[in-house]
């Protein structure tokens, strides 16, 4: 099962349960590269944004999602691979270089690329200082940056809560 079938099967349930909405989708190009730079409040953010955009969106995701143990670890890793998530090593310095290069490659091939400039979820719903990855992606790929705001998802799924309420 690939990105499209997962979106087609999981998407309607998410739309029915959570009724996410988007405003300004006309700013997302129908074709060609663009960087969707969003604040990050909850795990569910990475489901809602692709659900509301007509094109496939590849995201960076922490490398921990690809190294879990047991059945849950296997399921998470395979889901992340299937939806095109690029693992990023967040230990600092040049550790994230490979993930950013993979993002540049996707952008140069005309795809949408989602990234959370803060580098992690906000623990309290506030916006924190972003890292330089978005600027580097834009400068090296020539892709436009489209700002995205997630609103209220931290209330639906606080950090540590497994399933959004």
Q: Residues of each region from the PLM?
A:
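A transmembrane-helix-recognition feature enriched in membrane-embedded lipid enzymes
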Residues: 1-23, 55, 71-83
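Short, basic, glycine/proline-bearing loop/turn elements
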Residues: 9-11, 82-90, 117-121
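Short gly/ser/thr-rich secondary-structure transition/capping motifs
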Residues: 15-23, 95-97, 151-154
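A cross-family acyltransferase "interaction/gating" segment
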Residues: 28, 112, 123-165
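Catalytic core of membrane glycerolipid acyltransferases/transacylases, capturing the structured
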Residues: 30-93
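Residue-level preference for the first positions of well-ordered beta-strands
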Residues: 33-35, 112-116
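Hydrophobic/aromatic ligand-binding patch that stacks against planar heteroaromatic rings
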Residues: 48-49, 79, 105, 136-140
């Amino acid at each position: 099962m690939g990105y499209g079938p997962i979106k087609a099967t999981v998407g309607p349930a998410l739309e029915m349960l959570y009724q996410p909405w988007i405003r300004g989708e006309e700013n997302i190009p129908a074709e060609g590269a663009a960087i969707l730079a969003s604040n990050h409040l909850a795990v569910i953010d990475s489901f809602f944004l692709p659900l509301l955009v007509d094109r496939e969106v590849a995201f960076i995701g922490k490398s921990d999602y690809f190294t879990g143990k047991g059945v849950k670890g296997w399921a998470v890793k395979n889901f992340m691979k299937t939806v095109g998530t690029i693992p990023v090593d967040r230990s600092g310095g040049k550790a994230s270089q490979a993930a950013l290069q993979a993002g540049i490659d996707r952008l140069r091939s005309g795809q949408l690329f989602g990234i959370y400039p803060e580098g992690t979820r906000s623990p309290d719903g506030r916006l924190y200082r972003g890292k330089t990855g978005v600027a580097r992606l834009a400068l090296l790929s020539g892709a436009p940056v489209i700002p995205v705001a997630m609103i209220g998802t931290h209330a639906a799924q606080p950090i540590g809560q497994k399933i959004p309420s």
